[in-house]
From Swiss-Prot:
Protein name: Photosystem I P700 chlorophyll a apoprotein A2
Alphabetical GO biological process terms: photosynthesis
Species of provenance: Lobularia maritima (Sweet alyssum)
GO cellular component, one term: chloroplast thylakoid membrane
Main location (coarse class): plastid
Length: 734
């Protein structure tokens, strides 16, 4: 008999129903559950799949470069980055006739094109790329890396090149190599690129392989490095009148601490960024030599952890047993990695707009909005994944004997206190924030806006003042003009910072008021509730008072029969499922807030946000409705416009989102009956009945239907907001 899908599970392959396909897809990546899996094969499969992942990433970025070089307008855009719209790629087959062709022919193109809102043009321009040839070269290089990754993945599955489990579990060596190699050497290499290619390009000097060895990045060469006069590299920076990409007003410094932004590009100084990467490189190169490997010097992580026993015994046996627990659990390691990556991704969102690193990106408002929203959503999914794998760790990998009375065991011991405190915080935030919003709504409805409860965020304003924002008049730390820190800041460190923070044209430390106070607490409610659901899901994954033997049922189970007073919806998977809705909800509020505040800032009518954001009707009317009006008006008697495609996507996003509810709100029996009816009709319809299927159609399980519903809900939600965000921003700022 031919092997049927899924090959990794003979039990499933013999299932006569369509369950075989669904369960096969669901468990394809759950290597631990596959037939004949050993620990060694598990690690090797994961290792090989990393190479595949890298190949996909390199291929994707190569495609970006290739399509812009082929169909974009990079060389034209460089001449006037503020007024030429960057083209992502051509549209091969514009539907809806001539009006559509005209609507989408822009950015100086000959035919219909898509505009790039990803910031790649600004990025490539900043790092020194200048011609289409440069882009093609980059695309080919990444294609080569992609092929190399695929070969690497294949190679490490061959018997001779398969790494052993002991190699995968050598934590010290891995940490050393990742710190020194991944972070240290790559940061050093990037500093090299900035100093040798990007900074000269910003000063009008075109450095490529043919003249790479002849052009000195600094007039004094390596002299100052070897004589210890490092300050020479910071002397004579670019002036405030410097025109980016030309020698006009340029200096010779390569490593500076100017602070603030380049006046023309509104982005961080390239020489500051080179300095930053050099510092990071040195830090990580040192960090990558700290752990004990073959040479018997340096720290052993196990010894470090075992030594962590707090005085007074208040945390029991401290970190004893943690080393082996983490080192032997892939889920624990993945959970830690995802938690770190999630935080970093959210920080990227925050810093890309407040401290823009790429030339002219701060003036490309749609790109700013798209990048912020994109990174916040990605961060949300990654963070929920961290807790999901934390829960799987507790179910599959946690060994109570190994962790007796250490910090991990103690988390489980007092989980009720943790969960109840989080619950209390969520309830407090929710009722108080909603109470304030609703009170203000009622006051406006009754025509007495002066009776609103408006709370100034004085603590946040104080923190902003401490960093140098003077408009609140707090006169503290860096905003105190006669303090030593303020005076030192003018000359020794970051002289540009104080002028940047008090400029009103950037997004640094935006002025905040009562509307910000309220939405901040709404977001805090979302964060705490999402965390509550995720933490409870993980801490109760092994068992709860209602169901002490939960871990025997695995990560996801629908119900445990009618006993125990009802055990539906209490698996660790159900917690993850519920948390994703709250995560999307929270990031919705975050992105609404960011977008509305910035739209009013860019349009120069900040009072609209300040006055309308203190009550819910203001958000619904002056943000959502006002900004979606162009989208709801996509097709009208005047024909197509360039927003029509977003209007269609806005509708389509709502459709996908609403389809989610068909799977989320249902009961099981009627699905099966519906399927039987459809199958019956199919078999009795001429022509259609020529097509037969081998598997008996069965309805999705409860858990599967929830997953399908969740996927539609999430995708539709994000599609809808993406269309709204891009159309409302690009419609205003061209």
């Amino acid at each position: 008999m031919a092997l049927r899908f899924p090959r990794f599970s003979q039990g499933l392959a013999q299932d006569p129903t369509t369950r075989r396909i669904w369960f096969g897809i669901a468990t394809a990546h759950d290597f631990e559950s596959h037939d004949d899996i050993t620990e060694e094969r598990l690690y090797q499969n994961i290792f090989a799949s990393h190479f595949g992942q890298l190949a996909i990433i390199f291929l994707w970025t190569s495609g970006n470069l290739f399509h812009v070089a082929w169909q974009g307008n990079f060389e034209t855009w460089i001449q006037d980055p503020l007024h030429v719209r960057p083209i992502a790629h051509a549209i091969w087959d514009p539907h809806f006739g001539q009006p559509a062709v005209e609507a989408f022919t822009r950015g100086g193109a000959l035919g219909p094109v898509n505009i790039a809102y990803s910031g790649v043009y600004q990025w490539w321009y900043t790092i020194g790329l200048r011609t289409n040839e440069d882009l093609y070269t980059g695309a080919l290089f990444l294609l080569f890396l992609s092929a190399l990754s695929l070969i690497g993945g294949w190679l490490h599955l061959q018997p001779k090149w398969k790494p052993r489990v002991s190699w995968f579990k050598n934590a010290e060596s891995r940490l050393n190599h990742h710190l020194s190699g991944l972070f240290g050497v790559s940061s050093l290499a990037w500093t090299g690129h900035l100093v040798h290619v990007a900074i000269p390009a910003s000063r009008g000097e075109y450095v490529r392989w043919n003249n790479f060895l002849n052009v000195l990045p600094h007039p004094q060469g390596l002299g100052p490095l070897f004589t210890g006069q490092w300050n020479l590299y910071a002397q004579n920076p670019d002036s405030s009148s410097h025109l980016f990409g030309t020698s006009q007003g340029s200096g010779t410094a390569i490593l500076t601490l100017l602070g603030g932004f380049h006046p023309q590009t509104q982005s961080l100084w390239l020489t500051d960024m080179a300095h930053h990467h050099l510092a990071i490189a040195i830090l990580f190169l040192i960090a990558g030599h700290m752990y004990r490997t073959n040479f018997g010097i340096g720290h052993s992580i196990k010894d470090l952890l075992e030594a962590h026993i707090p005085p007074g015994g208040r945390l029991g046996r401290g970190h004893k047993g943690l080393y082996d627990t983490i080192n032997n659990s892939i889920h624990f390691q993945l959970g830690l990695a995802l938690a770190s990556l999630g935080v970093i991704t959210s920080l990227v969102a925050q810093h890309m707009y407040s401290l823009p690193a790429y030339a002219f990106i701060a003036q490309d408002f749609t790109t700013q909005a798209a990048l912020y929203t994109h990174h916040q959503y990605i961060a949300g999914f990654i963070m929920t994944g961290a807790f999901a794998h934390g829960a799987i760790f507790f179910i599959r990998d946690y060994n109570p004997e190994q962790n007796e009375d250490n910090v991990l065991a103690r988390m489980l011991d007092h989980k009720e206190a943790i969960i109840s405190h989080l619950s209390w915080a969520s309830l407090f935030l929710g009722f108080h924030t909603l109470g304030l919003y609703v009170h203000n709504d009622v006051m406006l409805a009754f025509g007495t806006p002066e009776k609103q409860i408006l709370i100034e965020p004085i603590f946040a304003q104080w923190i902003q003042s401490a960093h140098g924002k003077t408009s609140y008049g707090f006169d503290v730390l860096l905003s105190s003009t006669n303090g030593p820190a303020f005076n030192a800041g003018r000359s020794i460190w970051l002289p540009g910072w104080l002028s940047a923070i008090n400029e009103n044209s950037n997004s640094l430390f935006l002025t905040i008021g009562p509307g910000d106070f309220l939405v901040h607490h709404a977001i805090a409610l979302g964060l705490h509730t999402t965390t509550l659901i995720l933490v409870k899901g993980a801490l109760d994954a092994r068992g709860s008072k209602l169901m002490p033997d939960k871990k025997d049922f695995g990560y996801s189970f629908p119900c445990d029969g009618p006993g125990r007073g009802g055990t539906c919806d209490i698996s660790a998977w159900d917690a993850f499922y519920l948390a994703v809705f709250w995560m999307l909800n929270t990031i919705g509020w975050v992105t609404f807030y960011w977008h509305w505040k910035h739209i009013t800032l860019w349009q120069g009518n900040v009072s609209q946000f300040n006055e309308s954001s203190t009550y819910l009707m203001g958000w619904l009317r002056d943000y959502l409705w006002l900004n979606s009006s162009q989208l709801i008006n996509g097709y009208n008697p005047f024909g197509m416009n360039s927003l029509s495609v977003w209007a269609w996507m806005f509708l389509f996003g709502h459709l996908v989102w609403a389809t989610g509810f068909m799977f989320l709100i249902s009961w099981r029996g009627y699905w099966q009956e519906l399927i039987e009816t459809l199958a019956w009709a199919h078999e009795r319809t001429p022509l259609a009945n020529l097509i037969r299927w081998k598997d008996k159609p069965v309805a999705l399980s409860i858990v599967q239907a929830r997953l399908v519903g969740l996927a539609h809900f999430s995708v539709g939600y994000i599609f809808t907001y993406a269309a709204f965000l891009i159309a409302s921003t690009s419609g205003k700022f061209g």
